[in-house]
Amino acid sequence: MLVEKNAPLEPWNTFHIVAKAHSLLRVASCADVQRVLADPDWGPCPKFVLGGGSNIVLTGDVKALVLKVEIMGRRLLRETEQAYIVEAGAGENWHDFVTWTLDQGYPGLENLALIPGTVGASPVQNIGAYGLELQDRFESLDAVDLQTGAPFSLDAARCGFGYRDSVFKHGASGAGPGGAPPQRLGLAGRAMITAVRFRLPKPWKAILGYADLERKVLEAGVSQPSARQIYDWICEIRRGKLPDPAVLGNAGSFFKNPTVSPEQCADIIARDPKLVHYPLPDGSVKLAAGW
């Protein structure tokens, strides 16, 4: 176990902000975390989990033991008549993983191409784009408790997914009546994800309910685009809207699009008929924040 002192963090955040970690451990396995938690010197230290560094803004040096997640690996766990179940280590680059699934013939994540970050961070934010959210393809995850070192797994229900939200962004709710366990699982700062599994459905069906994608379909003159075509279009669209973080530091599209009632949407459209908006299954309407 090699812990770096005063480790530079500039390479590990997409804004390329110059800062240092009091100490940094490159985590290649769950066992690495368990060893550091059991260490009498490092175990009591505050911990800071770091993936791709695309959703953080460093305001100074990090006075904690930074756990830089570098758990790699991707594989097909099993195939059923209904789906491919694939698994990836938390340290895998998200976009590279999406590309790999397509190369292997497992479509279903193409709408989430080119989102910055790691596989392990994807459930934390419940990442989403162009009509698809991570929860739509999520099977389960493995994690380790940063207080006890105990490994555990969560299914979708226990992850508490919401719009760019999950239990990994919240603390536990208050205890129930009579000192019962907390009413809501909250894992912010208490867990590190080590692996994520995805359910990619068969047969595959294209998701095209966004104007940018529909425009690409018309330009290509195809009625049933392939997953690879959608992947390529998503990459083109995103590159046209956002600079490459390696060239110009940025955090990608991390903001939330506001949701309003149909009545509120109608009132706004009356004032700005060109407003980009999308109806949601629950009856509300999502507005394009970047409009």
Q: Can you say where each PLM-predicted feature lies in the sequence?
A:
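Phosphate/pyrophosphate- and phosphate-bearing ligand-binding catalytic cores of soluble enzymes
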Residues: E4-K5, E10-I17, I56, P151-W291
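Anion-binding (especially nucleotide phosphate/pyrophosphate-binding) glycine-rich loop
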Residues: L2-Q147
